[in-house]
UniProtKB/Swiss-Prot annotation:
Protein name: Beta-1,4-mannosyltransferase bre-3
Pathway participation: Protein modification; protein glycosylation
Classification via PANTHER family: BETA-1,4-MANNOSYLTRANSFERASE EGH
Gene Ontology terms describing biological process: carbohydrate biosynthetic process; protein glycosylation; response to toxic substance
InterPro entries reported for this sequence: B_mannosylTrfase_Bre-3/Egh, Glyco_trans_2-like, Nucleotide-diphossugar_trans
Function: Glycosyltransferase with a proposed role in glycosphingolipid biosynthesis. Involved in susceptibility to pore-forming crystal toxins in conjunction with bre-1, bre-2 and bre-4. Involved in resistance to the nematotoxic C.cinerea galectin Cgl2. Has a role in determining brood size.
A Pfam family matched in the record: Glyco_trans_2_3
Organism in which the protein naturally occurs: Caenorhabditis briggsae
GO CC list: cytoplasm
Keyword flag Cytoplasm: yes
Subcellular localization, as worded in the UniProt entry: Cytoplasm
UniProt-listed Enzyme Commission number(s): 2.4.1.-
Amino acid sequence: MNCEVKHALHCAVLVAWIVCFAYFCGVFTEPAEGTVPESPVASYGLVWTICLYLLRFTALLVLPQCLCNLCGLMMFNAFREKVQLKAAPLLSPFVCFRVVTKGNFPLLVKENIDANMKTCFEAGMENFIFEVVTDKAINLPPNPRVREVVVPTAYRTKSGAKFKARALQYCLEDDVNILQPTDWIVHLDEETLLTTNAICGILNFCEDGKHQFGQGVITYANGDIVNWLTTLSDSFRVADDMGKLRFQFKLFHKPLFGWKGSYVVTQVEAERDVSYDHGMEGSIAEDCFFSMVAMKHGYTFDFIEGEMHEKSPFTMWDFLQQRKRWLQGILLTVHSSKIAVVHKALLALSLYAWATMPLTSLQVFLCPLFPLPRCLPFDFLLSFVGALNLYMYIFGVVKSFSHKYRNSFLRLGMYLAGALMTIPFNILIENAAVLVGMFGRKDQFYIVNKDIQTV
């Protein structure tokens, strides 16, 4: 089955799933007589009726994100397995792979640098260097293609940026930066592993040179899986990359909903112009804040073909803390006076949809207990949101575990069942992250342990 057939099948299944889900939710059928009050105000009272309708409308805050995911998943083929180079690697621009770390896991960094460098050579890459930016010296072995940059303890940015933003800004200082304005930087987390496809996609993007920033897909199920629960939960993020992220970059060339902090490709001149020096509000989710400022400056973005590999958090506590930091960082970004509403409007809707999850989750119990009169367009949109979000888990598993279930439909079925079983856990964790994030301290940067040797 070639990639075109797979994509056509996926589109047909997605549309059928959305329609069937709406049908089984009763969107197209009239409720049994006497089960739905004709006047909710008379049955529930004015205040409670308003609350019920507000909850329904709140559930649609995520609609723009769902529509972008739908368009991204249907408009672009996600099943092409090989990325073709458009030009010889020898003629490609100079690329710096930059890894930022606290220095707590030196062995992990060393092993991944070696593995990634080997992948670069296998892809035929010549013009590159790896730069490890660390708070603590990790004493990498001497190598002309590896540069270790230790951020001085006394270093302070002009605005007081902290954590990863501070380290990234240090690399851009005149007396530290060794790159030319036309060179390119690929930002990686300390556990990120390159693939030949990702390198080909990066070289194509850099060679094209039309856009200053780019990003691709990260999957989390390669190699040994430490925690199946968190890995299956992260399958949603893979589908989100293939849907919303791809759609916003391919069609609009703007980070309308923000972007991730890894597998980030930037042109040096543009990155130095935008900078990471945006104070405390730009230090918790420095990636998201950076993308908003770059969009404000008029820079353009594109989607990069080829995937990279990372690990999901190893523990439920790390999973919770990771989500909490994302929520707090996006909250600070959305509420920043430095970014105009026109640039952060869709990001804000996405944030508020996330922040109101504890309330919208209650509808699972409230809808059967307090039914409201039918409104076909409104009810269909609600069922569409639910159907698409469920499908995202399924699609994410199909993409993430493709190397593990080849020629085994039984194994694929097990992975899909596992993903669906993790949904209640994921909802619980996301709700807990919202509560902890909204009412907890917003000046902390939790570092997730991705070193498998410490587990």
